[in-house]
Amino acid sequence: MTPPNQTVFVAWHAEQPMPRWAAVARLDCLYSELGDRRFRFSYTEGARTIEGFRPLDGMEDLHQVYESTSLFPVFKNRLLPASRPEFRQFLEWNGFDPDDPPEPLLLLGRSEGIRKTDAIEVFPKPMPDSHGCFVNFFFVHGIRFQPTAAERISHLHPGDSLTVRREPENPIDPHAIALEANGSMLGYTPRYLARDIERLLSQCPAETVRVTVQQVNLDAPLQQRLLCRMNACWPAGFQPCDTVDYQPISSLVPR
């Protein structure tokens, strides 16, 4: 059976002189009927509109579509090598079985491909599951800014429900989605999910939208401390990641 095609988006962010964030590219893993795999990289409209963005090394032409039979070095370098002794722990933190490693794009999207040396973030394009529902796994962001969050997280268990709360008055991002446990602030959903979650909260029956603890990684850095799972309905006509900055610049890439 041919594996399904996979898509992750690439976002760029900056904090100075003011916070800004945009999707700037997409990376697809495409399979032929024979199971042959190729990777396709292309820039999106966000790369042309967000101030300060520079093209990735080796892929400087915003209008070009880049293809390769192996993962591009700029993304391969964002994955921990399998030869490293901590690789098994890295897979476990991300919710994968170390004895059955996932496809590289699945791991890249789950781990977000974050490096301290740049402002790039990688995340998966949400797709409906086999039941036609929205299911997404993500790490809680912003834990370090909440004074009691780390201690509160240490008492959570898989399956615990979290409260999802909009923050329209948030001065940084009016689309921010906060996460709480028994009234205690833990952090936020990733920014790349916030607008879609807003729509799901508006269009899905309240009982179908749930965020639960998938696992707590007490020995992990804060950015990988709390892995959550979100379940929701998939409304008719719902298209995640459909704002202008997600649209491909090249006409050779399907929208």
Description of each model-found segment:
Residues 1-255:
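Conserved active-site motif detector
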